Regions:
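C-terminal/domain-edge helix-coil "capping" segments
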Residues: 24-38, 103-160
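Interaction modules related to DNA damage response and DNA replication/repair
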Residues: 52, 56, 60-72
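Conserved beta-propeller blade repeats
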Residues: 121, 163-180, 200, 204-224, ...
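Amphipathic beta-strand/beta-sheet edge segments enriched in Tyr/Trp
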Residues: 56, 71-117
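Bacterial N-terminal signal peptides
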Residues: 10-18
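A structural "domain/chain start" motif
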Residues: 22-57
Length: 389
C-alpha cells in the first residue's frame, strides 16, 4: 500500500502522553484524565461502505465523536473510489492539517491507514488501527488461537492442535507468540513464529507450565511453573536458559506482566488468602503487595506501555475491569469484563465482555471516554485477547 501525504502547517491541539512510569503526580493524572476524556468532534464526508465503517470504528475507539459538519471541530473530506483519500481541516481555527491518499491495499486497510494519520495529526499519538491482536476461540471442549486485525477482521487460525490452547502473549515488536497448549497431554508453553510458521516447545517441566510473558525487549520470559509444588513465578532467557525462581509461596501465583523498563514484574497471588496484585523485582531484591484500594480478588494485571497504569480484573460479585496507578493506590472501575490487555497507545484496552448466553465476546474500550465497541467475532466463544505492542 502506497501513501501520498503532505503535512500542512497549522496550529493544532496536541495531547502528549507523559513518559515517566512512576513520577506522575495525582494532580497531573487528574489533568490527563480530564483532557483525554473529552470527545473530539469530527465530521466525515464523501466516504461510503467499508471505508466509512472502518473510519467510524477507528476514530470512535480513539476518542473521537462523529458529528455533523456544523458541530465538528475537524472536517475529514475524501473518497474511496479505488483508493482512499482524505483532506483534514480544523474548522474552528480555519486551518488545513493534512492531505493524503492511500493506494494498493484493500478499502479497509487504506481506511485504517488514513485514520491513523488523522489521529496522529490531531492528538500527537500514534494510531492503533493497523495493530494486531491474538485471542482464544472455544468450540466445544477444545480451544484454538487466532490472530487478527485489532478490530477482529482478517482473523487467521494459528493453532490446530484439537485440544486446549490458551494464554497467547506477543513478543513486543515481533510476529511471535508464546502460549500454553495441552498438545502433549500436559499444560506446556510453546513459542510460535507467525512469519515462518515454525513453533517449538519452550517449557515442558513436570506439572503446570503457563502464563508466559516476554519482557519488553524480548530477551527474557516470565512464566508460571509448578515443578517444585505450588505455582510460582519464574524468569528465564528467551532461549529457555538461566531459569530463576522469583516467588516461593504455598499459594498459587498467576498472570505475570512486565514494567516497560523490564525491571519489575506484576502478578496475582493468593498468598494472603484472596487474590491480590504483587510487584517483584526481576533480580529478586524486593517484593511487595500493590495497593488496590476499592477492589478485591484482583487478577490478570497488564502494565501500560507508558508505565503509568496497571489494568486488571477484580471479582466483586462479577468480573470488573479496573485500573490502578503503577505505584498503587485508589482503583478506577471501568467496565464489566475480564482478560484486559493494553493497546500500544496506553489508552485503549481489549477485554472479554461478560459472556452472552455462555459465549465470550471480545470488545475494545477507550479508557478516558469509556466508549466500547465489540470487535468482529470469530465463530465460537472468544476470550483471552492480547494486543501486540
Amino acid at each position: 500500500m502506497k501513501c501520498q501525504c503532505s503535512w500542512l502547517f497549522a496550529c493544532a491541539l496536541f495531547l502528549r502522553p507523559g513518559t515517566g512510569p512512576f513520577n506522575a503526580s495525582a494532580q497531573e493524572r487528574e489533568l490527563d484524565i480530564e483532557r483525554y476524556a473529552r470527545l473530539i468532534p469530527i465530521s466525515l464526508e464523501g466516504y461510503t461502505g467499508e471505508a466509512l465503517s472502518a473510519l467510524r470504528f477507528d476514530l470512535e475507539i480513539q476518542g473521537f465523536e462523529i458529528t455533523g459538519a456544523d458541530k465538528a471541530q475537524y472536517l475529514l473530506r475524501g473518497s474511496n473510489n479505488g483508493d482512499v483519500s482524505g483532506q483534514l481541516s480544523d474548522r474552528v481555527n480555519k486551518a488545513n492539517l493534512l492531505s493524503t491518499k492511500y493506494t494498493g491495499g484493500t478499502s479497509r486497510s487504506e481506511a485504517h491507514a488514513l485514520s491513523d494519520a488523522v489521529v496522529e495529526r490531531i492528538t500527537g499519538r500514534k494510531g492503533i488501527a493497523r495493530t494486531k491482536i491474538a485471542f482464544k476461540v472455544e468450540n466445544g471442549q477444545n480451544s484454538e488461537l487466532y490472530v487478527a486485525d485489532y478490530d477482529g477482521h482478517s482473523a487467521i487460525q494459528v493453532t490446530q492442535d484439537h485440544t486446549i490452547s490458551r494464554d497467547p502473549a506477543w513478543v513486543p515488536g515481533r510476529r511471535v507468540l508464546y502460549y500454553t497448549s495441552y498438545k502433549a497431554s500436559n499444560p506446556d508453553v510453546y513459542v510460535h513464529d507467525l512469519q515462518s510458521g515454525t513453533r517449538r516447545a519452550f517449557a515442558r517441566y513436570p506439572g503446570m507450565n503457563a502464563g508466559a510473558a516476554p519482557s519488553p525487549d524480548g530477551r527474557r520470559v516470565a512464566l508460571v511453573l509448578s515443578k517444585n509444588g505450588s505455582p510460582d513465578i519464574y524468569v528465564c532467557d528467551a532461549d529457555g536458559s538461566h531459569l530463576e525462581q522469583l516467588t516461593r509461596t504455598k499459594e498459587a501465583e498467576s498472570s505475570p506482566c512486565w514494567s516497560p523498563d523490564g525491571r519489575t514484574i506484576c502478578y496475582s497471588s493468593r498468598e494472603l488468602g484472596r487474590s491480590a496484585l504483587f510487584l517483584v523485582s526481576v533480580d529478586g531484591t524486593f517484593k511487595r503487595r500493590l495497593r488496590t484500594d476499592g477492589a478485591i480478588n484482583c487478577t490478570e494485571p497488564d502494565w501500560s506501555p507508558d508505565g503509568k497504569t496497571i489494568v486488571f480484573t477484580a471479582n466483586m460479585g462479577g468480573f470488573q475491569i479496573c485500573t490502578v496507578p503503577a505505584g498503587g493506590g485508589s482503583v478506577t472501575p471501568l467496565v464489566a469484563g475480564e482478560d484486559p490487555s493494553w493497546a500500544p497507545n496506553s489508552r485503549a484496552v481489549i477485554f472479554t465482555r461478560n459472556r452472552v448466553k455462555g459465549r465470550g465476546v471480545v470488545s475494545l474500550l477507550d479508557v478516558p471516554t469509556k466508549q466500547t465497541k465489540d470487535i468482529q467475532q470469530t465463530s465460537g466463544s472468544c476470550s483471552q485477547p492480547c494486543w501486540a505492542k
